[in-house]
């Protein structure tokens, strides 16, 4: 019983460390609780700051679920205790004691906890999220579908009915946190994930512009991840200084020609004056 209480406290306190708020404060981004969807989670940080900050928050949130579950396994806790430790980490993420109980929706923390609890279950849940997000481009729909299937994946792969209640409670909490997303999905007002490629490609690949800037620091680099009109505008902007140089050279040559022609026009006037004398 003492081990159970200890692990529940550790899981909840680790889950209460909200990485979205910390990352936004560290890098000078808007407060995710006040901007965007007003949810301090990875998806909102992705919209507010970009892909690199969204992935950073996603990794930290997953670690909040991974570390307490690994600790529970190292202490030889029973599977039910490990599952409740995962539940405590998710509750801490949703209702953090360090941030006035205003937290995220617990999707990344749940996936991290499942990866540590049973790796195959975690992979299946993560794969479900990626597939749904890739085809429909709704992060909320992907979260709802993947987390809802987690308890049933555990029944198929583990077959232990004792771990079903805590995993089912996680599902209920995640669905409750997505209640506003349900209404927006029904009304067709839910914002989509805005990527130019598929979600999987965007997560796996780095931006071409950043790699080019690292190879050629201090030089102008045309971004390859933009449309054709922006490319032509950037190309014209790069060529403009050369045109200016050419025009200045032309002005210099014309001024030289004018100065050379002026003495020739004055010589005949002096000759006519001498002839009159």
Swiss-Prot record:
The keyword RNA-binding does not apply. This is Glycerol-3-phosphate acyltransferase. It comes from the Bacteria. Catalyzes the transfer of an acyl group from acyl-phosphate (acyl-PO(4)) to glycerol-3-phosphate (G3P) to form lysophosphatidic acid (LPA). This enzyme utilizes acyl-phosphate as fatty acyl donor, but not acyl-CoA or acyl-ACP. Keywords: Cell inner membrane, Cell membrane, Lipid biosynthesis, Lipid metabolism, Membrane, Phospholipid biosynthesis, Phospholipid metabolism, Transferase, Transmembrane, Transmembrane helix. The chain crosses the membrane at residues 3-23, 55-75, 79-99, 111-131, 155-175. Residues 240-253, 262-271 have a biased composition (Basic residues). It is found in: Cell inner membrane. It catalyses: an acyl phosphate + sn-glycerol 3-phosphate = a 1-acyl-sn-glycero-3-phosphate + phosphate. It is a multi-pass membrane protein. Its main location: membrane. One of its GO terms (biological process) is phospholipid biosynthetic process. Probably interacts with PlsX. PANTHER family: GLYCEROL-3-PHOSPHATE ACYLTRANSFERASE-RELATED, INNER MEMBRANE PROTEIN YGIH.
